[in-house]
Structures are given as structure tokens and as C-alpha cells.
Amino acid sequence: MEEEKRWIVVPTWRIPERLERWHSLIKYLKYKTKDLQKACYVPHHKVGWAWWTCSRVIFPLQEGSHLEVQGYWNLTPERGWLSTYAVRITWYSKDFWTDVTPEYADILLHSTYFPCFTAGEVRRAIRGERLLSCCRFPRAHKHQVPSLQYLALRVVSHVRSQGENPTWKQWRRDNRRSLRVAKQNSRGDKQRGGKPPTEGANFPGLAKVLGILA
């Protein structure tokens, strides 16, 4: 009697032909900028018992968990879709694992990778000082309820990057005296002479890089 065929079903995200772009970005951020230095990149390889091939990128996270993005080629040859690409995004913890959406994967990544505003930036913004940090992964905040501090720092960063408009100049004139007093009181702060904000491009997020739901 012929053995019954069994299927293993996992959720995947069908994408256009962007896995090479994804791999290039991962290698650039891992070896060039060191933003993803802790990530483990497993190149495109053949799975022995399957017809499809895959690659893996493993991102170690906090508390012993990790996020894994698997890229698949040739998932449905019986239909002639030999160029079909897809990814699976899985979060592994100590006690369980689950598949997650690209939006939640961005939140998990930002908890460990790519710097964000530090706690002292609100005080620096109020005193009119230069911000010493910035958020390199703004898309990770898109599907969260942002705090008022984060929204304010985003506005301040954007305004200063675009140059001082008339409204901003008027604000500076009206508050010059109070800012001068605040700066005098905080003259002993060693952080004022710190380094400028971390340079580098913002990470666009998994969905945008891979073209998920494009």
C-alpha cells in the first residue's frame, strides 16, 4: 500500500526577485558598517531532501532569543513557478518559537540593532544643544504607539537637518536668555563636548527591502 503523502505547512511571504538585494545589504551592514556584526549569514544552499533551496540570516536578540529570516527559491516547480521567491520570518525564544510579521520583526530588530535616541536627548533639545544621537531605524516605530518624547525629537532632528526656518529662528530669539542661563548652569556637563550623531543611512525595514506586499 502506498504511503500517504504528508505536507508540512509554514507561513511564508511571497516576494519579487529581491533576495540578492537583501543578501547584499546584510553583508554590507555586517562587514562594512558593523551595524549587524552579530548577525549570522548562511549563504544560499540546497536542502538535501527537498526540491527548493534556501538561505538564512540569524539575528541574535536579547535574553537568548533570536530572529531568523529564511529565503526560499523554487517553491512550486509543479506549477512552473521556477522563479518564485519567498521568505519566512521566525522568532525563537528559550521556551517557544513563532512566525512573525515583517512589522513585528522590525520592532524586534530595533530592540538590539541600530541606535535610537538616548535618554539625555530631551534635555539637550530643551537647552538648544546639538543632539548627540539619532534614530537609525525609524520604520520600527511606525507600528508602535510613539511616546511624546520620541515624536518631539523626530521633529527637532528634521527641522535642524533642513536648516533653520523663520519660525525656528523666532523661537531661538524669544528663548535666547533662558537658553543662555541653562547652558551656564550645565557648563560642567561633560557630554556637551561629545561626538556628533552617529552617521549612516537609516535601515528601511524588512518589508521594504524584500518588497513584501509591494
UniProtKB/Swiss-Prot annotation:
Lineage per the UniProt record: Viruses, Riboviria, Pararnavirae, Artverviricota, Revtraviricetes
What's in the domain note?
The BC-like-box motif mediates the interaction with elongin BC complex.
Q: Where in the cell is it found?
A: Host cytoplasm; Host cell membrane; Virion
What's the protein name?
Virion infectivity factor
Asked whether the keyword Nucleus is assigned, the reply is no
- Miscellaneous notes for this chain? Vif-defective viruses show catastrophic failure in reverse transcription due to APOBEC-induced mutations that initiate a DNA base repair pathway and compromise the structural integrity of the ssDNA. In the absence of Vif, the virion is morphologically abnormal.
Kindly state which keywords UniProt assigns to this record, in alphabetical order. Host cell membrane, Host cytoplasm, Host membrane, Host-virus interaction, Membrane, Phosphoprotein, Ubl conjugation, Ubl conjugation pathway, Virion
Positions in coiled-coil regions: none
The record lists the organism as Simian immunodeficiency virus (isolate Mm142-83)
